[in-house]
A protein has these predicted regions:
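Conserved alpha-helix/loop element of class I SAM-dependent methyltransferases that forms part
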Residues: 145-166
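N-terminal helix-turn-helix DNA-binding core of bacterial DNA-binding proteins
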Residues: 14-55, 78-85
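Class I SAM-dependent methyltransferase SAM/SAH-binding core
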Residues: 170, 175-224
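A short acidic, Gly/Pro-enriched loop at the edge of an enzyme's catalytic core
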Residues: 223-233
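C-terminal alpha-helical "lid/dimerization" subdomain adjacent to the S-adenosyl-L-methionine
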Residues: 261-320
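Amphipathic alpha-helical dimerization/coiled-coil segments
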Residues: 2-5, 89-136
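A short SAM/SAH-binding and catalytic strip from SAM-dependent methyltransferases
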Residues: 232-244
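A short glycine-rich, Lys/Arg-flanked "PGG" loop and its adjoining helix->strand segment in the class I
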Residues: 247-261
């Protein structure tokens, strides 16, 4: 007589074991540290950690099974980022505690250098794109979202902030200068920064046509320490061209005067990969939670947000973050 042995079910302990296993390897812990405020593809992580693609893919699979990383497909590439800990769920507190300890790690110098190389490769690709398409910039921009499609919503949010008549503004990456006239009418002084001479020339021509005497154009990397500060910093459909968006927000925060605002207009996350080649986008939009998390990590407070659906299937997010008068405690 054959007796059937009941199969024991250990779903909860399996989940806990998976999390413990994922955190039990130094390379995986360093991968989590590298993903603290960035997203990388498999090939980029293989380059950063000087590891074969198959090896890094195995480690990422273990991290994904433990729900420590989330994936996002952009065209044929899959990008990895850290998953947020949900402390109300089973294993959530351990997940959060693990990430807190990981954030105390300092990545080896050679890993930091390779991350910088990956960022510079991304930045070079974006810079080369704008050098090539300056003459057709507006047509390229219109493929996704032209300024008239979201201008009223952006201006409505901007006007609701009630800046003083003496307030100043800084626009990063003004493109052909399409938003500069609106800023010039609302601020005493406007500074526009761009690292592309071709694009800055388009902005200069617009300022000349419109007689914008209170706009100053500077050929300068916005993340440069010599960049000006202002009461309102504007990133209008430009963050997706940054090599490291979270780091960009962190470095731009000191450019915002205390009590001032950061206005970000961006695409929500999408999967239309043609935007990379047609529009030079390094990122296919952003998750709403990611922008909020990056801003919070930089010491900014989330304020009003507006979301717009466009007829071509894209969604735009208009986000407002404020720099408090007193410094926040940033973990």
């Amino acid at each position: 007589m054959n007796l059937r042995v009941p199969q024991l079910r250990f779903e909860a302990s399996d989940e806990l074991a998976s999390l413990c296993k994922a955190g039990g390897d130094p390379l995986r812990l360093n991968v989590l540290r590298a993903l603290a405020n960035d997203s990388f593809g498999v090939l980029e992580l293989a380059q950063i950690f000087a590891t074969g693609q198959s090896g890094i893919s195995h480690h990422l699979k273990v991290l994904a099974q433990a729900r420590l990383v989330a994936t996002r497909r952009e065209g044929n590439a899959i990008f990895y980022r850290r998953a947020l800990a949900q402390t109300e769920l089973f294993c959530g507190k351990l997940h959060a505690a693990l990430l807190d300890e990981v954030d105390a790690l300092e990545l080896p110098a050679e890993v930091q250098q390779r991350i910088a190389v990956v960022h510079s490769q991304r930045a070079a690709a974006s810079h080369d794109f704008f050098a090539r398409i300056a003459d057709s910039f507006q047509a390229q921009q219109d493929l996704i979202a032209s300024l008239p499609q979201y201008r009223d919503s952006l201006l409505g949010l901007l006007d609701s902030l009630n800046f003083a008549s003496s307030a100043t503004a800084l626009e990063v990456g003004p493109g052909d200068g399409g938003f500069l006239p609106e800023l010039a009418r609302r601020f005493a002084q406007v500074t526009a920064l761009d690292n592309s001479p071709a694009m800055l020339e388009l902005a200069r021509q617009r300022c000349e046509r419109e007689g914008l005497a209170n706009v100053q154009l500077e050929l300068l990397d916005a993340l440069s320490q010599s960049a000006a500060s202002a009461d309102c910093v504007v990133l209008n459909m430009v963050l997706h061209h940054f090599a490291a968006p979270a780091e960009a927000i962190k470095q731009l925060t000191p450019r915002i005067n205390l009590g001032g605002s950061l206005l970000i207009t961006e695409l929500c996350s999408h999967n239309q990969s043609w935007a990379r080649d047609a529009c030079g986008d390094l990122w296919l939009g952003f998750e709403q939670d990611d922008l909020a998390r990056w801003a919070s990590a930089a010491g900014l407070m989330p304020e009003e947000s507006v979301y717009l659906g466009l007829r071509n299937g894209f969604q735009i997010q208009v986000r407002h973050f404020r720099r408090p008068l007193a410094a926040l405690t940033v973990r």
